[in-house]
From Swiss-Prot:
Residues 1-16 are cytoplasmic. This is Probable glucuronoxylan glucuronosyltransferase IRX7. Keywords: Cell wall biogenesis/degradation, Glycoprotein, Glycosyltransferase, Golgi apparatus, Membrane, Signal-anchor, Transferase, Transmembrane, Transmembrane helix. It comes from Arabidopsis thaliana (Mouse-ear cress). The gene is IRX7. One of its GO terms (cellular component) is Golgi membrane. InterPro entries: Exostosin (IPR004263), Exostosin_GT47 (IPR040911). The keyword Cell wall biogenesis/degradation applies.
Length: 448
């Protein structure tokens, strides 16, 4: 009996050992199979990428877990990726080709540092941002492009008399660039330039004149009338200087200067200026040319509120004026020679409620920046009532407007970053261009 039990116990032990051996073998086989499958997939993926890089010279982005984890890590540390990952499906598979023009059209002008920092510098920032685009938006193959960007800087010819940009050379410089691309490439001639994009970051856009009457008389040059113009000028009524396909863009304000201003402002600092304006305010608005600066609006502001302690009005220049904007509740943005003003961007970026005094102005990127929610509009004829209007707003919905101004996406949409970042001004330009793809030869040919 004992012997029989002993044999049965030995048999059970052998069975258990045999079962464990089988289980270990199966698990080992599974892990080895998984390893070789993964290794083979990685090898094939690596081979595929290598073939792609050898056969296709256009830059592409390949996501990896390491890249993803590094981006999360960078975000936690407060850093952002140095290159934007912009995929074409965000903009209806939009593709842009940037002409590589001789340096006399763009880079040579950068010898003057002001060229990259003044209020007209969006022409430079956009060029740099387009060149920085990673992913699939910028193409190095012009035959697969929807649009062609022609980078000509015309705002960097600063006057030795008053320091302001002189743009009398703009028409001839752009015309020379068009002659160049139309003779060396086939793309301009096939559409008469309708799929070509230019910048005109001046008072009256592609009319290229600082005085409105002269701008209207000259109009948009014939050689640009079929193209797309990215311009700071825009009005809601018919105007000769926007009788061309156009996208209204914000004036350029250096992101670095704004970051520096924000960094130097104490978090607990209260806004101790109620209404702020610093800039040109003529006591006698009719200048030597016989024209009235700002349609007398700034003169009327000075005459009505120059002695009002609620209004901090300054006529002299001050390098640290952004810190004054950051201390203010309301920031006046009256027209100058043209309706638009860099104060719009600075006010939004620094959390001061913009008070827009420019009848009929068309503002940039209205689908993203809900201007009625973050600003006030006062008619030019109502400047004399400005104090009462602002008192009423302060007593009713000021806190709502200020809360809307805190939305970071609003501020981001008005900034030109290099490289471009998701949601910024360059991103908004790409979004606007993606809605004009009916001009693309590549798209029309795909339906033939």
């Amino acid at each position: 009996m004992t012997t029989h039990k002993h044999r049965r116990t030995e048999k059970n032990l052998c069975f258990k050992q045999y079962y464990k051996w089988i289980l270990c073998f199966i698990l080992t086989l599974y892990f080895f199979a998984s390893f070789f499958v993964d290794h083979d997939q990685d090898h094939r993926s690596s081979t595929s990428i290598s073939k792609h890089l050898l056969t296709n010279h256009k830059p592409k982005l390949f996501a990896s877990r390491a890249m993803f984890e590094s981006k999360i890590h960078d975000h936690k540390l407060g850093f952002t990726s140095q290159q934007p990952n912009i995929k074409t499906d965000v903009f209806n598979n939009l593709k842009i080709y940037v002409y590589d023009l001789p340096s006399k059209f763009n880079k040579d002008w950068l010898a003057n540092d002001r060229c990259t920092n003044h209020l007209f510098a969006a022409e430079v920032a956009l060029h740099k941002a387009f060149l920085s685009l990673e992913g699939d938006v910028r193409t190095e193959d012009p035959y697969e492009a929807d649009f062609f960007f022609v980078p000509v800087y015309v705002s960097c010819n600063f006057s030795t008399i008053n320091g302001f940009p002189a743009i009398g050379h703009a028409r001839s410089l752009i015309n020379d660039a068009i002659k160049l691309v139309s003779t060396q490439y086939p793309f301009w001639n096939r559409t008469s330039g309708s799929d070509h994009v230019f910048t005109a970051t001046h008072d009256f856009g592609s009319c290229f004149h600082t005085m409105e009457d002269r701008a209207i008389a000259d109009g948009v040059p014939i050689f640009l009338r079929n193209s797309i113009i990215l311009q700071t000028f825009g009005v809601t009524f018919n105007h000769p200087c926007q009788e061309v396909e156009n996208v209204v863009i914000p004036p350029y304000i250096s992101p670095e200067s704004l970051h520096k201003t924000q960094k130097n402002i104490p978090v607990t600092k209260e806004r101790d200026i109620w209404v702020f304006f610093r800039g040109k305010m003529e006591l006698h608005p009719k200048n030597i040319s016989g024209r009235f600066y700002s349609k007398r609006v700034r003169t009327n502001i000075w005459r009505s509120y120059g002695g009002d302690r609620r209004f901090y009005l300054q006529r002299q220049r001050f390098a640290g004026y952004q810190s004054e904007i950051a201390r203010s509740v309301f920031c006046l943005c009256p027209l100058g020679w043209a309706p638009w003003s860099p104060r719009l961007v600075e006010s939004v970026a620094l959390g001061c409620v913009p008070v827009i005094i420019a009848d009929g102005i068309r503002l940039p990127f209205p689908s993203t920046v809900r201007w009625p929610d973050i600003s006030l509009t006062v008619a030019e004829r109502d400047v004399g009532k400005l104090g009462d209007i602002l008192e009423h707003v302060a007593a009713t919905n000021l806190s709502v407007i200020q809360r809307n101004l805190e939305d970071p996406s609003v501020r981001r949409a008005l900034m030109f970053n290099v490289p471009s970042r998701e949601g910024d001004a360059t991103w908004q330009v790409l979004e606007a261009l993606s809605k004009k793809l009916n001009r693309s030869v590549r798209r029309s040919n795909s339906f033939l």
